[in-house]
Amino acid sequence: MAKPTRKRRVKKNIESGIAHIHATFNNTIVMITDVHGNAIAWSSAGALGFKGSRKSTPFAAQMASEAAAKSAQEHGLKSVEVTVKGPGSGRESAIRALAAAGLEVTAIRDVTPVPHNGARPPKRRRV
């Protein structure tokens, strides 16, 4: 039986893009796209092997950001605009990690969705 051939990842030569950081209370997802929104690279705290409450730490967000940046730089990415969504603890550390990985951060935008009094929020936790 013939061996299945793996699809080779095509190197995209993209100079600038957008880094979308989705920081929830439980996880941090970093996705780097081109200016049209087509994904170049992504990473998350959970994908790197962090489990449970460790996923929501700033260190996990930093590692996810570094992994996504390293993968995007292989496609020739040099500068990014950053959009941050969500209330998570990994917001600042993810942005710092992108800059430390060698990507030039040109703009930081907060796109956290704020309801105009929409659905009822979940009840308060009593710990």
UniProtKB/Swiss-Prot annotation:
It comes from Streptococcus sanguinis (strain SK36). Coiled coil: none annotated. InterPro entries: Ribosomal_uS11 (IPR001971), Ribosomal_uS11_bac-type (IPR019981), Ribosomal_uS11_CS (IPR018102), Ribosomal_uS11_sf (IPR036967). Located on the platform of the 30S subunit, it bridges several disparate RNA helices of the 16S rRNA. Forms part of the Shine-Dalgarno cleft in the 70S ribosome. This is Small ribosomal subunit protein uS11. The lineage of its organism: Bacteria, Bacillati, Bacillota, Bacilli, Lactobacillales. GO terms for cellular component: ribonucleoprotein complex; ribosome. GO terms for molecular function: rRNA binding; structural constituent of ribosome. It holds the Pfam family Ribosomal_S11.
